[in-house]
Amino acid sequence: MRLKMPYGISNFEELITENYYYVDKTMYIEKLENLPEKRIMFLHPRKFGKTLFTSVLENYYDKEKADKFETLYGKTYIGKNPTKLKNSYCILRFNFSGINTENEESTMIGFKEKVSISIDGFAKKYGIDFFVNQEQTTEGIMRSLIEAFKLQKPEDKIYVIIDEYDHFANELLGFYPEHFRNLVSKNGRVRKWYEILKEGTETVVDRIFITGVAPITLDSLTSGFNIGTDITQDVRFNEMMGFTKNELIEILNSQDILKEEQEQILPIMKENYDGYKFCLEAKNQIYNSNMCLYFLNRYIEFGKIPTKLIDVNIASDYSKIGKMLDLCKGENRLEILRKTVQGEPINNNIVEKFNPTIEFNETDMISMLYYLGYLTISGEDLGMPELTIPNKVMKQIERYSEFEDIKDIEGLRKYTIVVAGNELYIEEI
């Protein structure tokens, strides 16, 4: 039976049990576990499979999923080469996407709700006698859980997984920077929550894995958290997310797509979805996995190359997060966008932590374009990364960003992004 394309599927158990194709990334479980550091941060642009990978970790390490190990991982690398820590943790998972960031109050309510739901589910799943007291602060709820776990589960350890740690923070920073600063400042509620999580690493929290897009909140949060290691630019993990060319060909073969057809569609996919490199030493470029699955899902369903090569969800997602570029107020912002759209390479060191309390400079903005996926590493000059637009799709999206900047400067009327065929167009509202 031909396996289904997992477009939009981010739950690993669902993907395996409901016969979706899985590009095996489980060898990276072993690589992560073998690192000396136990607290890991991994940043990538949107739509590269980060949420699915956190689900892979969750199912692998969850002690309550031991009886499902063979079903879920039997055909994978890690199923044939299990590590000593498999199915040995209580998994506490948070996902901070979907929070209403209209104002500080709604943001904090949403953050507390996300934390409360995760903690309540965790307590019920692992049989912890614990009540989420909504009268407590968010950090108070976290502290109480850690204390209850320590008393009731002295033999167990917690693996904390935080997906999209910066999602709501990025939206705040792009649209309401003052709200952002208040929440992550020294006395901010979000900052205090991370401080309690840090305290937990001294007792019951053994491992942490965090995903996000940009290190925009790291400088604000981690002086209180001291997160271990950011492996974003570690060559060993360049291919942990997204697809390599060989992985993409394996997908095509699994769908019985003939070689003649592959020769027709692979150049199109390469031109539009390939081109990403996240560290200087990497040899292989990476395809955006979500864009590839969008294309293949339609190609298989309709038997022809899709008319629209750009997923409208991706286009709107990137244009929305691109609001963070407004942090750079200098005149060079527009010039940088124009240079990149014209295909000119830019040599620039990549900033590892942003400080949003001060105005972004040119280096910060170029680095932000790299983290958001607008630019990628294409080479080096005297040890400095050379950055260019990775593919045609991102070039179209960045042209939209350039137009938005012109609109802001010239005070024109509001416009919106429209996907038509293989192009992005600007339409007056």
What positions do the PLM features span?
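Phosphate-binding site recognition
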Residues: 1-398
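Nucleic-acid nuclease catalytic cores
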Residues: 401-429
